[in-house]
Amino acid sequence: TLVEVVPWLTSLLENTFGNYLDLLTLVCIPASSEANNNARFEDFSKRLTNETDMDNAFDHIQVVKDATPKHLGGSGTPILHFDEDYFNGRYILLFDDVITKGNSMLRFKRKLEALGATVIAGVSVGKTTHERQNQSFVQI
């Protein structure tokens, strides 16, 4: 919950960046749909940036078209619009709630750097793990 995550992240970021934290801009990597993105990151980004004095980029990246799932022939990636001028010259802290391989974070790093930003770090609060299903073995 936000009540637990925001103080934990605030402490982590203050210990890591100290007095430089207010020079950073928080960029949450958008969810696959506008509705999910707003539900996941709008309140979170406001709370975290209020606690840390970072700038909040939430309103500067819009989900223009929701992602089409891969199993339906889509890319699984939403179409986004970036307020390009906003990112030029900024120092970015990327945030993804759950990371699997890091591809989204790498893609966003490259996109923001192409817009003139410098990505300082990326942070996540969870990692996807895949566990094998309980398999039945036949004894020989």
Predicted region positions:
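Short, surface-exposed alpha-helical segments at coil->helix boundaries
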Residues: N38-E42, K46
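Residues at the starts of beta-strands that form the adenosine-phosphate
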Residues: D55-A57, Y91, T118-A121
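Histidine/lysine/aspartate-rich catalytic loop segments that bind and position anionic ligands
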Residues: L48-T68
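Active-site-facing substrate-recognition patch
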Residues: T1-L24, I61-Y91, K101, G126-H130
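Short glycine-rich phosphate-binding loop at a beta-alpha junction
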Residues: L21-S33
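Loop/helix-junction capping segments adjacent to catalytic residues or to phosphate/diphosphate-binding pockets
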Residues: E34-N38, K101-G102
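PRPP-dependent phosphoribosyltransferase catalytic core
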Residues: L106-I140
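A phosphate-binding catalytic loop at a beta-strand-loop-alpha-helix junction
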Residues: L94-F108
